[in-house]
Structures are given as structure tokens and as C-alpha cells.
Amino acid sequence: MKPLASLRDIKTRINATKKTSQITKAMEMVSTSKLNRAEKREIVRPYMEKIQEVVAMSASAARSHPMLVSRPVKKTGYLVITSDRGLAGAYNSNVVRLVYPKRSKNAMLPPDEIAIIVIGRVGLSFFRKRNMPVILDITRLPDQPSFADIKEIARKTVGLFADGTFDELYMYYNHYVSAIQQEVTERKLLPLTDFLAENKQRTVYEFEPSQEEILDVLLPQYAESLIYGALLDAKASEHAARMTAMKNATDNANDVIRTLTLSYNRARQAAITQEITEIVAGRNALQ
């Protein structure tokens, strides 16, 4: 009876693994579809670059604007973009681990010297479990978010810098390079000093009304658009990471199925051989 029991156990494991591989394959296909849609949103890049050029040119003559001036840093803000779901490999852990050591290094400092803004349930859970100061969060965003979906948190984030809640703001997210490569990115968002350093005036425009009045409206909107752009980038990375993770899981499941099938065939062959041996032995005993 033992060989039969062993055969049943192996068969049960094969069936269970097949069901798992079907699930991971379906998730891989869904993520592939979502990634294809997310990649189409990359067409906004030329528009963003043109806006960036205009803002840089406008700001070049008005560097005294509060959003363009570095000030003594008493408090630093971290905007961390994660996902609402797991099963995406190291997508989330790579981002939060980049931020967490910074908090650890500043562990002796008062908590009010650090402020964390989180997009995504995974990051929110991570930071709250470690009693880190999360002052703003948003979860349950759609897989293809529109600007309206994050307009409120983007506006509040820029407003927190403007009213002095923190003196500088860094963004952390996964930058989409390709379907098989995503890079964890740290980018200083506010003040826009790095942005000014990267962009030099190349075209001369005439403004009506004044540049200062335009910047009062344009700079906050531009900072909000940078947050939205990072979110789109992160979403594409999330779908790519999940697609890759599910493909690897499916491949591993298929390897396990092949190994178990080989074990099943060997066990079945051994059981048949044993039965034949017992029959032959019984026949010889009767002679």
C-alpha cells in the first residue's frame, strides 16, 4: 500500500502545482496587457520636456521665487511611490529600503525632522509598522491613473513645501527602462534648484503678464506634473516587475511539474515491478 500512497501524494502535488502555474500564467498575461497600455502613456514625455524647457527659461530670470530657492533644511520630506499589491518581485522592497536607511541614520534626531508621503498600500504598511512619520498617503489608485486621481495629494504635497512643513522634498520610485529593467530612482523635487541646473535657457519668450505672476501659477503646476510623471513611470515599472515575477514563477512551477512527473513515473514503474515480482514469487511457491 505504501507505493500507492506515495503515487497519490505525488499526483496531488502535480495537480496543485499545475493549478498554481495556471494562476501565475494568467497574472503574467494580465500584467503584460497592463504594461502595454502603460507604455503608451510614454507619449507624454515630449510634452513634459517642452513644458520643462519653458519653465526653466521663465525661472532663469526669477530665481528668487520661493520654489526655486534653497533654504536651511530643518525638515526633509520623502515622497515614496509603491504599489497596492505585492507579487512583483523586489519592486517595493527596493524603494522602501532606499528610504529606510536614511531614517535609521537619523534615528537620534527628533521625528519632526522627517516627513513621509506615501503612494501605495505596501509602502504605507511598511512605514507605519516602523512608526515612521507618515503625514500624507493615498492608496487604491487605478492601474492606469489619470492626473485627476492624484491631483489632490500632489497639490497638498507642493503646498506642504510652500507653507514650510518641510524644506526640501525627495521622490523615490522605480524608473521604467524596459520590460526587464527598472531602476530605483532618487530625485530631488523641491526646491527646483536641480531642475534649474539641468536646464539652460535656449529660447527667448515674451510673457504677459510678468514672469513672476506666471511662475506663481506655473511652478506649482509643474511640480505636480512631475509627481504625476513619476507615478506613471512607477506604474509601468510595477506592471513590468509583476510580469517578470509571474513568468519566473510559472517557469519554476513547470520545472517542479517535470521533476514530480519523473518521480511519479519512476514510482509507478517501481510499483508495477514489485507487483510482477510478487506474482512470480507466488507462482513459484505453488509449483
UniProtKB/Swiss-Prot annotation:
What is the topology of this protein in the membrane according to its UniProt annotation?
A: Peripheral membrane protein
Q: Which GO terms describe its biological process?
A: proton motive force-driven plasma membrane ATP synthesis
Quote the subcellular location field of this record: Cell membrane
Pfam families, alphabetized: ATP-synt
- Does the record bear Cell membrane in its keywords? yes
Q: Which GO terms describe its cellular component?
A: plasma membrane; proton-transporting ATP synthase complex
Does the record bear Acetylation in its keywords?
no
Q: Name the keywords, alphabetized.
A: ATP synthesis, Cell membrane, CF(1), Hydrogen ion transport, Ion transport, Membrane, Transport
Stated family: Belongs to the ATPase gamma chain family.
The function of this protein is: Produces ATP from ADP in the presence of a proton gradient across the membrane. The gamma chain is believed to be important in regulating ATPase activity and the flow of protons through the CF(0) complex.
Record's subunit section:
F-type ATPases have 2 components, CF(1) - the catalytic core - and CF(0) - the membrane proton channel. CF(1) has five subunits: alpha(3), beta(3), gamma(1), delta(1), epsilon(1). CF(0) has three main subunits: a, b and c.
What is the official name of this protein in its record? ATP synthase gamma chain
